[in-house]
Curated annotation (Swiss-Prot):
The lineage of its organism: Bacteria, Pseudomonadati, Pseudomonadota, Gammaproteobacteria, Enterobacterales. This is DNA damage-inducible protein F. Signal peptide: none annotated. Its main location: membrane. One of its GO terms (molecular function) is xenobiotic transmembrane transporter activity. Belongs to the multi antimicrobial extrusion (MATE) (TC 2.A.66.1) family. GO terms for cellular component: plasma membrane. It is found in: Cell inner membrane. It is a multi-pass membrane protein. The chain crosses the membrane at residues 2-22, 29-49, 63-83, 111-131, 154-174, 180-200, 207-227, 265-285, 289-309, 338-358, 373-393, 416-436. Disulfide bonds: none annotated. Induction: By DNA damage. It comes from the Bacteria. InterPro entries: DinF-like (IPR044644), MATE_fam (IPR002528).
Amino acid sequence: MPPGVAVCFSSLFIRLVCMAFLTSSDKALWHLALPMIFSNITVPLLGLVDTAVIGHLDSPVYLGGVAVGATATSFLFMLLLFLRMSTTGLTAQAYGAKNPQALARTLVQPLLLALGAGALIALLRTPIIDLALHIVGGSEAVLEQARRFLEIRWLSAPASLANLVLLGWLLGVQYARAPVILLVVGNILNIVLDVWLVMGLHMNVQGAALATVIAEYATLLIGLLMVRKILKLRGISGEMLKTAWRGNFRRLLALNRDIMLRSLLLQLCFGAITVLGARLGSDIIAVNAVLMTLLTFTAYALDGFAYAVEAHSGQAYGARDGSQLLDVWRAACRQSGIVALLFSVVYLLAGEHIIALLTSLTQIQQLADRYLIWQVILPVVGVWCYLLDGMFIGATRATEMRNSMAVAAAGFALTLLTLPWLGNHALWLALTVFLALRGLSLAAIWRRHWRNGTWFAAT
């Protein structure tokens, strides 16, 4: 073939590939997903810094304590993740329906819930911590470090939960810049304070907790300033905000109930990994903390696509536009599938080097290498359930999300029966089964709705 013809065919092939993988829907998805990916990865980046900073102290007890404390915090706060999820779905639907009064309601009502729940957690933190550490069990030295971490960390509860609402609302109105500023500035501040308080002032686990508390309240202030700006842009008046606490509160509570039950099952499964890992020894819990940081980093990055799907799915639901919904879904599958595969390749080729950066403890590095294969498998298994979560959140189909999570949790529990034979591998196998079942069950429900034409039916 003459060189000129070869170049022509190559150029045509590249254009066809770009047309297939970068349609207008793909570009619209990336417009919202890309800033969310970059802002999202600052969240696990904070976890990476926590792990790296604490992991370079002179004992694995500190790392284990932060792992237990972070898991308890995640379990409790993520039970209230419905504050962000329901806010995003309802806000996106109001945005699609072009209803400013509904937009005001989807901000004020969940914000009141968040501040009330956060205040209760801060006031009652000591008995809740006692209960959490009693359930976890394990090394007394690790539990003591976890207690020191949590006594300070949970003072941030009102701000942390309010920030979930602000993030959900900003995402729902598709103002991509605001969530980026909210997450990036807050988490960078957290990272800087983390290094200074832990390494500079030698505050150990208390320093890591205090850094997060300061950063959460700073983020809340920034978020409120951003929301104030966007209220003006969206034509939402002060009178609308004053009356926004009224009306449809029962629907919000019912929606949040189902999402909270879903979140409870999710956190029970992830909490089981820490609890059962702690009973396998201090080294195992430290190893799993390092590996879970990698998984969290991947999940948050891929959640950038899920967040974009939430916003577009909710907008399409509010406008009753099935064509837009299907275009966004196909674009999300293409783009997030490629990114998930890239994560798997990176962990396959450079996983050992990444672990070495996170901890200088040789025994932890060597032990972590045995379980690295799960970090290669999990991105390509988990990406589909993240995307489908976005579809269902946007449509506020919380009951079906709850039922899907129940199926996945049952599969997780059954897989744990292999623990006496597989040891720590059983924990990671159970997590893989859990993510796979979430994706498969949601896909089956989505397929049924699409065939029957019932996706846009009232929820």
